[in-house]
Amino acid sequence: MRGFTYLSKVLHSHSSYSKLLVLCSVSTGGLLVYAESNVESGKQVVEQNQPESKKKRVVVLGTGWGGTSFLKDVDISSYDVQVVSPRNYFAFTPLLPSVTCGTVEARSIVEPVRNIIKKRSGEIQFWEAECLKIDPVNRTVSCRSGINDNLAGHNDFSLQYDYLVVAVGAQVNTFNTPGVMEHCHFLKEVEDAQRIRRTVIDCFEKSVIPGLSEEERRTNLHFVIVGGGPTGVEFAAELHDYVYEDLVKIYPSVKDFVKITVIQSGDHILNTFDERISSFAEQKFQRDGIEVSTGCRVTSVSDHFINMKVKSTGKHVEVPYGMVVWSTGVGTRPFVKDFMEQVGQEKRRILATDEWLRVKGCSNVYALGDCASVDQHKVMEDISTIFEAADKDDSGTLSVEEFRDVLEDIIIRYPQVDLYLKNKHLLEAKDLFRDSEGNEREEVDIEGFKLALSHVDSQMKSLPATAQVAAQQGTYLARCLNRWDQCKSNPEGPRRFKSSGRHEFLPFEYRHLGQFAPLGGDQAAAELPGDWVSMGHSTQWLWYSVYASKQVSWRTRYLVVGDWVRRYIFGRDSSRI
């Protein structure tokens, strides 16, 4: 007892160094004590009106996966970091489908940006505002606050930068399909998930009103998901569980009218996954009564009907619906389009960067995540330059030894070469020099070298628009900036084939750590490195553990796990809030 009294006095006298959180568990009578230390809190928060810093200024646009991972790793002792985002929180977007049905609450998957900044001793400045324009010539960004206009002060401001990190994500791409913006729900933001949740309840409440015909009830309870990718499939699975585990118990009179349909333009859902997972998902959806319409393209959406074209027959079909969720396509934000025009990328669909995440056409601007794509160099475009650099004796032929000396740099600069060698089971450089009949060759001329590498570029793959890619890019860029001076004097990248010397940094290399597809009924599918595929109930528990561990803070980790436990015990809430 004396020890507890002493501890209480210590905590009370040093409140700036620790927090005490006491959580009483009603169901078990247990007591959990959680102490969060803050050894850095003695430092003063940097004020906005501080004297001008001699440090280079890095302006970060966005607080998604790319921006947040960058903020967590960048060396703030070397850079003056300033963040601009229209939302003052980071959202764990892979759990948005769970938010739509109340499996997880919205506040459980968000972490305030200022909490993240606080852990960096408060030396990062944040402004809740939207970027309107990037001026790469004068190195400024124009911003506007969306906070209540009735409050005093102006809303527009601009920031100068030495380095700009564009990590604003993407908006929905409707492919100019008529009626999509007016009548469809999307699933990109937390607010989208909350609107979907309210609409689902609206559909059920409207369907139990007296006097409606059976046809009207069926229409109201027909939920259509456009897009058979991971987001669409996971939402369909979550919705199915929500309906048949919770809602039919409180709306028993309309349980027979519920229908869930997934419309996919391709031949299979989850077509970016292993074929075994795609097949497993389709079979499970069939057992669950979820209709999967593959080979169909939506042509328009009206207030009560969705029109689609069946590719195999060319017929147009009109389908009544109660709610449509559009979960396909990645679009570019307006100010990013304007920026692309300024840097000569107006003909591209998405912002292009090089392998070091530098935006092409301008200097000191980097782009991460869904708003950009890495434009990889093709080997065949540089084949002559590579040959000349490797031919040290200027003999006009390339020996196996000469090629072996530059192969490591080639693989780093052109990762598709490594993929080609592995896929063709070519273990050594000499294997690549074999002629069409399989005979070994000690040397090749330029034409033979072109022939040897002619199929390499077919291995090039664009990076998927996932949280995993954006997070790795943010970490990579932060580490590059942290080691800027060191790598400028001692380059660590591959050799420059078009000039002398070496690149300062290694190019970004994405490491695929696997992907999950929750399929409802406490079953999931996973595709993990090493061609390992797992499906079933055990995979769902693996999904729980991985997603809990990937939360950005202990606070959100506790809240998410608590929501999962609450759902198991009490079910999902059906209140329209």
From Swiss-Prot:
Location of the transit peptide in the chain: 1-35
Function statement: Calcium-dependent NAD(P)H dehydrogenase. Binds calcium ions. Alternative NADH-ubiquinone oxidoreductase which catalyzes the oxidation of mitochondrial NADH does not translocate protons across the inner mitochondrial membrane.
Lipid bilayer topology: Peripheral membrane protein
Molecular function per GO: calcium ion binding; NADH:ubiquinone reductase (non-electrogenic) activity; oxidoreductase activity
Subcellular localization: Mitochondrion inner membrane; Peroxisome
Species classification: Eukaryota, Viridiplantae, Streptophyta, Embryophyta, Tracheophyta
Family listed: Belongs to the NADH dehydrogenase family.
Residues the entry annotates as binding FAD: 57-87
The protein's name: External alternative NAD(P)H-ubiquinone oxidoreductase B1, mitochondrial
Binding-site list for NAD(+): 221-257
Annotated cofactor note: Binds 1 FAD per subunit.
Enzyme class: oxidoreductase
Top-rank taxon: Eukaryota
Annotated ranges, domain EF-hand: 378-413
Gene: NDB1
Reported cofactor(s): FAD
Pfam families given in the database record: NDH2_C, Pyr_redox_2
UniProt keyword list: Calcium, FAD, Flavoprotein, Membrane, Metal-binding, Mitochondrion, Mitochondrion inner membrane, NAD, NADP, Oxidoreductase, Peroxisome, Transit peptide
Regulation of catalytic or functional activity: Activity is calcium-dependent with a more pronounced effect at higher pH.
GO cellular component: mitochondrial inner membrane; mitochondrial intermembrane space; mitochondrion; peroxisome
Motif range (Microbody targeting signal): 568-577
Primary location group: mitochondrion
